[in-house]
């Protein structure tokens, strides 16, 4: 499995709005080709969310990173005063080529 995690830290007053946006977006991402899982994770005592997605292939993950859904995820984070960071989770066995995020 090829996986990515997006760590999103919203402005405190925008926390609930961003959570609802991320949950709706996760539903749409789950329908994307090659998506095995997409979940919004949060800790009640923390101020950040983690959106974790798993993909059947490296090509599926790369396609997601170029998708409208990923652009919406990035845009919603910025629009709602959040900072976001994307990290790639190691698959077993690790993929042969690293994935880079378009900027």
Regions found by a protein language model. Name each.
Residues 1-49, 56-68, 77-78, 82-103:
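Short S/T/G/P-rich N-terminal loop/turn motif that feeds into the first structured element of a domain
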């Amino acid at each position: 499995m090829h996986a990515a995690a997006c760590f999103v830290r919203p402005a405190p007053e925008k926390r609930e709005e961003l959570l609802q946006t991320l949950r709706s977006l996760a539903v749409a991402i789950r329908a994307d080709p090659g998506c095995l899982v997409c979940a919004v994770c949060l800790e009640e005592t923390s101020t950040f969310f983690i959106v974790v997605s798993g993909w059947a292939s490296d090509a599926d993950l790369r396609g997601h990173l170029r998708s409208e859904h990923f652009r919406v995820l990035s845009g919603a984070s910025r629009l709602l005063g959040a900072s976001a960071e994307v990290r790639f989770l190691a698959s077993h066995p690790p993929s042969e080529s690293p994935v880079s995020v378009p900027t």
